[in-house]
Amino acid sequence: MKLTQATTLLLSLGLSLPVEGFSLSRTNAVGPKPPFRPLPASTPRNKTCQVQSNGDGTDDAPYILAALKQCNNGGKVVFAEDKEYTIGTALDMTFLKHVDLEILGKITFTPDTDYWQENSFKHTFQNATTFFNLGGTDVNVYGGGELNGNGQVWYDLYAEDALILRPILVGIIGLHGGTIGPLKLRYSPQWYQLVANSSDVLFDGIDISGYSSSENEAKNTDGWDTYRSSNIVIQNSVINNGDDCVSFKPNSTEILVQNLHCNGSHGISVGSLGQYQGEVDIVQNVLVYNISMYNASDMARIKVWPGISSAMSEDLQGGGGLGSVQNITYDKMYIENVDWAIEVTQCYGQKNQTLCNENPSNLTISDVYFNDLTGVTSGKNDPNVGTIICSSPDVCSGIHATNIDVKSPDGDSGFVCTNVDEEFLDVECASSS
């Protein structure tokens, strides 16, 4: 059962994309499910630029910028396989057009936490910051090389101060038309990838891993976070991390996620949404297909803040925002040692259920489909394997669950169901709260 289609496909990830470039349509590289809209093709590349390296751990950012400017508009920039590159300067690469970055070697970001807190790129959402911003039109990044965020110094520092600004390893910011992968991503200080204000981007063959070597956990290491982006495809990837495998943040639309192997995560999550009062968060038209999830807190997860201010942690607070979650499908999923097979909540960050019910979410959930989910939970929440908690039936409708064959190690299969129409749930609503 472990050898799902996703696992089988991942055995050949190294062959999934041609290292010489992308002469074919990006749409043809997507499968088995098609993208919501066709992805634009790349134009031919007709020149090559090699990136120099000091080779001694000092900053190579000037060489990278020089090569990008030289080969922009129709070229390929190569990071050699036999070289290691160091980045010690925040790089604005949002000017790119019709260019490839072939990363064959290893790129490491310096562990200068003071510099990066001051100079990393600041984004408005959830205090996100990035080592670099990569954007523009028709940009491909591939080669199978490694980006290393030197995360250990950040894991230890965050344990001392939860308000530090930890950079995201990969910032795809304002990219319209692009392919990312195959690549290895290692030891990100926080999220591995932020995809913001972007469209028509394919992620294919991403290998994510990086755990703490000290007693301080590597926290908030999401694989992907999409934000204000549309027509994004994430496929054929392996993720070993400690937070969401993929998270659809506000205003993510037409997102396809397929053929992933996730381990140690918090699941594939819609949200969190409704965090900021006065903001309108929309996530709609999302398909999650053929996912294997191991040793995780959740498989399929939707997390929405209630209508009252709540605190998830010292650096994560909110509630009262507006918006909607609509037309979300999770299909063909396998779990092993996962706490919740399905978790839907409109009370995110609020432990007092009575208070949540008295202040229901301002953000509606509708037309959600969970199909063909199999496997065994961890047993942590026995006798229940799933939970669907709405803050009010007025803001939560059309949640469907079919062909759900999930049990705990003891054979239990109950669901917690609150303020939800059980007519569409092919599960045992064994308890309510």
Swiss-Prot record:
Signal sequence extent: 1-21
- Coiled coil stretches, renumbered: none
Give EC number(s), comma-separated: 3.2.1.67
Disulfide bridge partners, by residue number: 245-262, 390-396
Q: Does the keyword Repeat apply?
A: yes
The family database entries (PROSITE patterns) matched by this protein are listed as: POLYGALACTURONASE
Alphabetized, the UniProt keywords read: Cell wall biogenesis/degradation, Disulfide bond, Glycoprotein, Glycosidase, Hydrolase, Repeat, Secreted, Signal
Looking at its record, which EC class is this enzyme? hydrolase
- Where does the record place it? Secreted
Active-site residues are 243 (proton donor), 266
- The PbH1 repeats extend over 229-250, 252-272, 325-346, 360-403
> Polar residues: which segments have biased composition?
43-54
Which SMART domains does its entry note?
Answer: PbH1
Q: List the catalysed reactions.
A: [(1->4)-alpha-D-galacturonosyl](n) + H2O = alpha-D-galacturonate + [(1->4)-alpha-D-galacturonosyl](n-1)
PANTHER family, per database record: EXOPOLYGALACTURONASE X-1-RELATED, PTHR31736
Function of the molecule: Specific in hydrolyzing the terminal glycosidic bond of polygalacturonic acid and oligogalacturonates.
This chain belongs to the protein called Probable exopolygalacturonase X
The organism encoding this protein is Aspergillus flavus (strain ATCC 200026 / FGSC A1120 / IAM 13836 / NRRL 3357 / JCM 12722 / SRRC 167)
